[in-house]
Amino acid sequence: RPHLKKAFGSSPFDGDGVATRDREVVTDGVLNGYFLSAYSARKLGLQTTANAGGSHNLIVKPGDQDLTGLIRQMDRGLLVTELLGHGVNYVTGDYSRGAAGFWIEKGRIKHAVEEITIAGNLRDMFRGIVAVGNDALPRGAKLCGSVLIERMKVAGR
């Protein structure tokens, strides 16, 4: 949504000078296209999506539940509240990040968790999305609520 008034990521043109336009990146869980600059589009034999410099006001459609509802739905698992470091391979989608948060039992916070690592592949993580919360906090040009993911690899004590 590159034309939202007073939004941080709004711009009439991308970094290549191409006019920006609204587009839906994912519909019903299906990827509609990539974020392509003029250069990357040429390399792939595709058309630019006017995204040189990245996305413009990327908004993930919220679900019906707030964070408390997502925790109840999870029942047992890890609520990640902090990610540490930068361990994402953008070519393969593999990631490994330090994390901290809270362990959940019976839909309630049981205890704090720190010095753990979450790892996996972004494709698998995106496929495992169960729900997106309605608790989004604006952060720059991205807007997304809490995300409930079916399963992730966690290491630590």
Regions found by a protein language model. Give the residues of each.
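Dual-mode signal for accessory low-complexity, basic/Gly-rich regions
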Residues: 1-157
